[in-house]
């Protein structure tokens, strides 16, 4: 039996796109800022949707959500995102002012970099990012933190330096995995009573020789 070239192409494409589960979309071309650690180019739709929302709410100019910042994907899920406003190609091409309400759908996100933007608050859904291990949001304009921040059980590195935070929720003491908390240069007026019970050496400096508080 002879097959036409069009049929061969159709069969090839159906086999290619058929590799993705229903919640994923296959991307035939990936920009240079995207790294696939493990897996193929089937990327989780909800992760892409959050990127789209981040672009839209801040009027960022990208032709594709995959162009935002530096992205690392693991088995189809977004695991690392560098979206700091560094003035170079590793971060975003303009300032982020607002985080979308659906950011909590990044449940597999492990490391998120948002330094040098103008973010003033974190959505309540932020604490639904159950896989978050390290979060860098220094040099923004944060005033408060979500009361439920203590639910981020995997978080071990939290950089809040150079913001305008006036108080820290008591729930932060529930972060049993936390080993690094940088709150240098904020407007802190008081600290939770449980702070001294956290598994951290408050008398030490960070690796750069800077104190945790100032």
Question: Predicted segment positions?
Answer:
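Consensus "Asn ladder" position of solenoid repeat domains
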Residues: 94, 117, 137-140, 160-163, ...
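Sec-dependent N-terminal signal peptides
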Residues: 3-16
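The feature encodes a structural signal of leucine-rich repeats
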Residues: 99-104, 122-125, 145-148, 168-171, ...
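N-terminal capping/linker segments that flank leucine-rich repeat
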Residues: 15-102, 197-199, 209-210
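Conserved hydrophobic beta-strand positions in leucine-rich repeat
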Residues: 79-84, 110-114, 133-137, 155-160, ...
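Leucine-rich repeat
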Residues: 75-77, 89, 96-97, 105-109, 119-120, 127-132, 142-143, 150-155, ...
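Glycine-rich active-site/cofactor-binding loop and its immediate structural neighborhood
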Residues: 96-101, 105-108, 113-117
């Amino acid at each position: 039996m002879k097959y036409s070239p069009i049929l061969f192409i159709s069969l090839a494409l159906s086999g290619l796109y058929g590799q993705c589960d229903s919640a994923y979309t296959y991307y035939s071309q990936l920009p240079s800022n995207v790294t696939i650690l493990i897996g193929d180019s089937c990327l989780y739709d909800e992760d892409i949707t959050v990127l789209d929302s981040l672009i839209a709410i801040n009027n960022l100019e990208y032709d594709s959500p995959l162009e935002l910042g530096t992205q690392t994907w693991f088995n189809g899920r977004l695991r690392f995102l560098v979206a700091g406003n560094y003035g170079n190609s590793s971060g975003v091409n303009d300032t982020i002012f607002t985080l979308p309400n659906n950011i909590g759908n990044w449940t597999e996100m492990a490391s998120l970099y948002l330094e040098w933007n103008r973010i003033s608050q974190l959505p309540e859904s932020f604490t639904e990012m159950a896989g978050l291990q390290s979060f860098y949001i220094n040099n923004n304009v944060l005033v408060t933190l979500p009361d439920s921040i203590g639910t981020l059980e995997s978080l071990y590195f939290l950089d809040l330096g150079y913001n305008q935070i006036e108080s820290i929720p008591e729930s932060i003491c529930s972060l049993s995995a936390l080993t690094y908390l940088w709150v240098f240069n904020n407007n802190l007026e008081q600290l939770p009573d449980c702070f001294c019970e956290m598994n951290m050496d408050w008398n030490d400096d960070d690796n750069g020789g800077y104190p945790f508080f100032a």
